[in-house]
Amino acid sequence: MTHRVINFYAGPAGLPLPALERAQQELLDFAGTGMSVMEVSHRSKEYDAVHEEAIVLTRELMGLPDNYKVLLLQGGAHLSFGMIPLNLLRGGRKADYIVTGNWAEKATKEAKLVAGDNVRVAASTKDEKFARLPKASELKIGEDSAFVHFTSNNTVEGTQWKEFPKTDKPYVCDMSSDIMWRPFDVSQFGLIYAGAQKNLGPSGVTLTIIREDFLEMCEASDLPSYLRYKLHAEKNSLYNTPPTFGIYILRNVLAYNKSIGGLKAIEANNRKKGELLYGCIDRHAGFYKGFVTEKADRSLMNVDFFLPNPELDDTFVKEAKKAGMVGLKGYRDIGGIRVSTYNAVSVQDVETLVGFMDEFARKNG
């Protein structure tokens, strides 16, 4: 077997090995076509089966009601930042954005370029370096708000909404870094979007889930065609040539997720990984210092912490790499260490890291 490292990169991130092995087996002859899936027409029945299976598996794993559409788009969260206000904030509609980190701030900035003062900041923890999430009492949400936008997991800062913001308004949510980490009730969500490259598949696919009443808000015939959610829904995400190989890998990952017990089993693994990693940080509190100030806000997808000095941070990363673990260097604006423990990272992988951390603290503390 080819040598594999333990991948803690924040994105693009590791993928389940069985999903990759399936792609390896089918790479040169997909579905008996004598071609790779990368070479097959997106209008062929062989590709169409993959496309539909990815949509069906998304619906099944997330328990989506019939009044939600699943779209397989491109452009990542960056394009979605603009598409959302272009489609949903027409005719003077207003929205409130909760700013909890680097990506939430970018989403707000892009929305303001489109809708100006109709995009309002409901709360921000920027003054505290986004080291915690806003409390319910800090949220200022207008009665005239069409939706409340938030980022469910803040990849850079390592905070996560395990309980969604308290409001009676519909949610629009960037779930790029924690989609499908657990089951949840989607009924309050008008739109969910997620770049695939952290928890679902390779870069190049943006999974978008939109409720039908929100789709009806998207009367946007004056927009360039690709920017219209309604058109993509009508064409079943085949208006243009889709990222076929990315969707194929997405299908493989979703099929694997189903085979291991779905989102309930995935949640159990994610919670166990969090217990192990945060347990180690708290056990060595004089050596490892977490970035997040409120324990309830700690992310189970991205864990940020610091060692006593930057030199030790660098040594930690280098020695971990020698031990077969990569992707641990912290985000450039924060520094320290960042461990990304997305769905594809196993409990055993985290146990290996925690063993390394215990020994590193013993030797250097």
Positions of predicted regions on the chain:
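Active-site C-terminal subdomain of aminotransferase-like
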Residues: 16, 196-278, 294, 365
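Active-site phosphate-binding strand-loop segment of PLP-dependent enzymes
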Residues: 111, 124-179
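Conserved active-site segment immediately N-terminal to the catalytic lysine
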Residues: 172, 186-197, 206
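N-terminal "arm"/small-domain region of PLP-dependent enzymes with the aminotransferase-like
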Residues: 1-41
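Conserved N-terminal alpha-helix of the aminotransferase class I/II PLP-enzyme fold
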Residues: 32-80, 87, 102, 110
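PLP-dependent aminotransferase-like
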Residues: 78-146
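Conserved PLP-binding catalytic core of the aspartate aminotransferase-like
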Residues: 288-319
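PLP-dependent enzyme catalytic core of the Aspartate aminotransferase-like
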Residues: 5, 322, 331, 335-365
